[in-house]
Every structure is written in structure tokens, then in C-alpha cells.
């Protein structure tokens, strides 16, 4: 198992402004060129923790993920975070893990934050995800999932690294 240099990016997210948030992220990625091998972004990094799912959702083939896949290849690093996704007429707080080799992995947040009314605007996921990356098995979860430790229990040492993307 090789080591992985990880950078955790926390920014002042511009509320519901995908283009500006992507522009700001691009600046940060340029400054990290050659310094890191994985970048962890906040939950809903491109919009803020918005409940405007119908207005802001994109499919996995949308502009946000397409742009991030290009940057993962360009900057030779893995990128993970979450965004507002749509699939089969449902909306998800979807975590993504994109590799420089073009692999893409997705996890839909299981435990929605009821006090923030997230469950009124998003569907919950029902599958945990273990990502194989550079000899590591990575479990990727989202924010409020942290409050439910049974969901992240490492039975039979399934994963080596647990990442929670949070806001």
C-alpha cells in the first residue's frame, strides 16, 4: 500500500453559484499541483447545503462532474466531495470519488439531516461504497452519516480509510 498525500479543502462557498465555486476550486487545484494526490471537498461544495434540489441538481454526466473529471486527469489527483444529483426523477446528496485514470464512484447519503429538512428534498441512499484506490480501500460517507456509527462499522476490515465529506 503506497502513501497518499491528501488535501482537505474548506472554502467560503458562494451560495448556489456553481460556476463561481468551480472557478474558486480551480484556483486552489492549480496551487496544489504536484503537492497532493487526493483532494477532499466539502459536502455540496458547488452550491452550499441548499435544499433547492430541483433547481440545482445535475446527472453524473452534468457540467460539475464532467469538469471535475477533467481536472482530476489534468492535475493527476483524485477528487472527492458531494453535490446535488438527480437520477430517475429522484434527488440525492451524492458523494463522488473521481480518479486521474478516469474511474468514477458514487455514494448517495444514507442518513439525511431531518432538522435541516434534507429528507423533504432528497432521497436517501441504501448502499455503502468501498472504493479501491492505489492499494487502499476507502469508505466514502457524507456528513450526518457520522451520527450513525453502525453504518460505518468496519466489519472484517473492509476498508483502510474512512472519509466523511461534510459542510
Predicted region positions:
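Short polar catalytic/cofactor-binding loops
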Residues: 10-15
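Active-site catalytic loop in hydrolytic enzyme cores
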Residues: 57, 86-157, 161, 165-166
Amino acid at each position: 500500500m503506497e502513501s497518499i498525500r491528501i488535501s482537505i479543502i474548506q472554502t467560503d462557498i458562494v451560495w448556489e453559484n456553481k460556476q463561481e465555486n468551480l472557478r474558486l476550486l480551480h484556483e486552489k487545484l492549480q496551487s496544489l499541483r504536484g503537492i497532493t494526490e487526493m483532494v477532499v471537498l466539502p459536502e455540496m461544495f458547488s452550491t452550499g447545503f441548499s435544499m433547492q434540489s430541483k433547481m440545482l441538481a445535475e446527472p453524473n454526466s452534468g457540467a460539475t462532474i464532467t469538469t471535475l473529471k477533467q481536472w482530476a486527469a489534468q492535475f493527476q489527483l483524485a477528487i472527492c466531495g458531494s453535490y446535488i444529483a438527480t437520477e430517475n426523477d429522484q434527488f440525492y446528496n451524492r458523494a463522488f470519488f473521481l480518479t486521474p485514470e478516469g474511474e468514477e464512484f458514487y455514494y448517495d447519503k444514507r442518513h439525511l439531516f431531518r432538522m435541516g429538512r434534507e429528507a423533504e428534498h432528497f432521497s436517501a441512499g441504501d448502499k455503502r461504497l468501498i472504493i479501491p484506490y492505489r492499494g487502499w480501500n476507502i469508505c466514502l460517507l457524507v456528513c450526518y452519516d457520522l451520527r450513525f456509527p453502525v453504518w460505518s462499522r468496519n466489519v472484517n476490515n473492509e476498508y483502510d480509510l474512512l472519509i466523511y465529506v461534510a459542510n
